[in-house]
């Protein structure tokens, strides 16, 4: 029975071994910055880690994490090929560690023939005892990792020398292996069925009349079908060493063939197994995404083709926003959205109604057919609670959920959350079938309260994961907004989508009353603040300003 399920447990063990290896690396390499959370996903996504690890190896360990999560959360069977891929990729990472930090490095090649194929008798009770001992060892290892910190300097020096004198060449993957190892797994993680009576994915799907040449055949790498039997999307796969955009022309030709056959043009993905691009040339622009989309999300996007309206003709509800500058902000965002821009920054002085403007924008985009699900992010639970209460007053007809205190309503139209809560929810929140609830295209609009550089630095993974329209809100004067915040929202000239500053609110709009300074003495003004005296939490808070 144990060997019958060996393929299912190998990914879990590989993931556990990878986690220990990654934590070891953090303990000895002082160039790595510890992320906010020390879970495996956060550790391998941290910017300095990505820059340190060999690019191909980093892509391979992402597969180990994904397959491990799939095995743990869904209970679905894992094939021998998938289990071997996970083991092979773990081997590549450990080999890279040896190459950089090992004392007696030897260039090795993964050899699956060394894995025993014959069944042998096992002592089940002995295995159970060993598993218990392993758990105890894990705790001991955690303690030993901390002792390694004093050796960081010597390890860093060894790494620099070893990389100059040693050779390391990770294996490239063929187009076929790319499909089997990485794209198939992404499809499974998004709930697609590749085989069986409920299969909704066709592989090497034949199309005719390529490039409008009668009888000329082509074979689509993947076609994703909806519940109505109509194609929702095509996937064009290329080797991992190739830019996924290389398959763009081929994907368009396949989509056009399917349009002639079915009367509707499917959306398109191009991918090399790691980097993926998506576009709907009927109603959207091409852009990178974290993975393929779920069936439900693709159907939503397909339906939206006929639902979208001209946003300039959608009346703004005066019951929500009746001030001219709030309406100007909404119109500015809507105009940019219709031009294909996906990131927007609103700079509005405190007290001028940022949350009210955000709810009115949500209302306009919803009635215009652009938005179904909304995510509102704030950095404190009190702000999340207040924002939900405000939205409830402004949009009483929409279902709302404060994810920080209520997991039951996570399918609500508008979800409110802190950044850490959402970071966990991305991988942990699942439906009865074990499929992810918060898929990459689940949210159509993401509102970021009090946008500042520390948020994008610490929680960048959230914004890279979700594919929705981003709207950042900040009260920081536009000239004081950090340059990298403008870069994040892709504004080259440090000019936001719309700005309504304090001076205008006081002197022109008379929305705010002026403030007056009263001079007082504090320890801060007299003695100053010294960074070394601050707690880590206070250092982070100070960094925001």
Please place each PLM-identified region on the residue numbering.
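Amphipathic alpha-helical interface elements
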Residues: 1-135
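Phosphate/diphosphate-binding loops
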Residues: 256-260, 265-269, 448, 477-478, ...
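Conserved nucleotide-binding/hydrolysis micro-motifs of P-loop NTPases
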Residues: 240-242, 274-277, 381-383, 420-424, ...
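ATP-dependent helicase/translocase motor core
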Residues: 95-373, 382, 386-398, 410-414, ...
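Conserved helix/coil segment N-terminal to the catalytic DExD/H
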Residues: 406-414, 420-441, 460
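SF2 helicase catalytic motif II
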Residues: 434-472
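Interdomain helical connector at the RecA1-RecA2 junction of SF1/SF2 helicase-like NTPases
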Residues: 483-545
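A short hydrophobic beta-strand->loop->alpha-helix junction that borders the nucleotide-binding pocket
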Residues: 377-381, 404-406
């Amino acid at each position: 029975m144990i060997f019958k399920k060996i393929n299912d447990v190998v990914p879990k063990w590989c993931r556990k071994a990878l986690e220990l290896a990654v934590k070891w690396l953090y303990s000895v390499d002082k160039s790595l910055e510890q992320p906010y959370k020390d879970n495996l996903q956060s550790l391998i996504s941290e910017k300095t880690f990505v820059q340190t690890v060999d690019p191909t190896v980093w892509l391979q360990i992402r597969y180990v994490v994904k397959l491990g999560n799939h095995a743990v959360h869904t209970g679905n069977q894992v094939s021998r090929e998938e289990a071997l891929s996970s083991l092979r990729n773990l081997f590549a990472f450990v080999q890279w560690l040896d190459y950089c930090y090992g004392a007696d490095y030897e260039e090795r090649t993964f050899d699956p023939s060394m894995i025993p194929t014959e069944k042998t008798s096992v002592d089940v009770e002995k295995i159970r005892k060993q598993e218990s001992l392993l758990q105890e060892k894990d705790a001991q290892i955690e303690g030993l990792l901390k002792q390694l910190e004093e050796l960081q300097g010597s390890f860093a020096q060894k790494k620099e020398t070893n990389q100059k004198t040693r050779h390391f060449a990770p294996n490239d993957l063929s187009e076929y292996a790319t499909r089997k190892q990485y794209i198939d797994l992404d499809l499974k993680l998004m709930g697609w069925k590749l085989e069986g009576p409920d299969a909704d994915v066709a592989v090497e799907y034949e199309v005719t009349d390529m490039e409008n040449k009668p009888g000329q055949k082509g074979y689509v790498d993947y076609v994703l079908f909806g519940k109505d039997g109509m194609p929702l999307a095509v996937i064009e796969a290329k080797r991992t060493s190739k830019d996924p955009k290389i398959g763009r022309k081929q994907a368009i030709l396949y989509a056009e063939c399917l349009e002639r056959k079915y009367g509707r043009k499917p959306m398109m993905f191009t991918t090399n197994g790691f980097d993926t691009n998506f576009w709907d040339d009927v109603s959207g622009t091409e852009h990178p995404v974290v993975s393929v989309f779920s069936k439900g999300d693709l159907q939503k996007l397909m339906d939206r083709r006929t639902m979208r309206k001209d946003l300039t003709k959608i009346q703004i509800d005066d019951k929500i926003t009746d001030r001219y500058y709030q309406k100007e902000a909404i119109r500015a965002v809507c105009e940019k959205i219709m031009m294909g821009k996906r990131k927007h920054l609103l700079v509005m002085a405190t007290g001028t109604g940022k949350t009210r403007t955000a709810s009115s924008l949500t209302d306009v985009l919803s009635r215009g057919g652009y938005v179904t699900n909304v995510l509102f992010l704030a950095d404190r639970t009190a702000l999340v609670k207040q924002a939900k209460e405000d939205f409830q007053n402004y949009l009483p007809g929409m279902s709302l959920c404060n994810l920080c205190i209520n997991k039951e309503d996570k399918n609500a139209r508008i979800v409110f959350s802190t950044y850490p809560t959402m970071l966990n929810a991305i991988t942990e929140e699942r439906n009865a079938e074990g499929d992810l609830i918060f898929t990459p295209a689940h949210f159509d609009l993401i509102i970021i309260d009090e946008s500042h550089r520390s948020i994008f630095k610490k929680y960048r993974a959230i914004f890279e994961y979700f594919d929705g329209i981003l709207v950042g809100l900040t009260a920081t004067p536009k000239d004081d907004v950090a340059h990298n915040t403008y870069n994040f929202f892709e504004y080259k000239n440090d000019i936001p989508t719309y700005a309504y500053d304090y001076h205008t609110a006081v002197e022109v709009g008379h929305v705010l009353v002026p403030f007056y300074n009263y001079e007082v003495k504090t320890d801060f003004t007299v003695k100053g603040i010294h960074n070394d005296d601050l707690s880590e939490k206070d250092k982070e808070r100070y960094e925001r300003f």
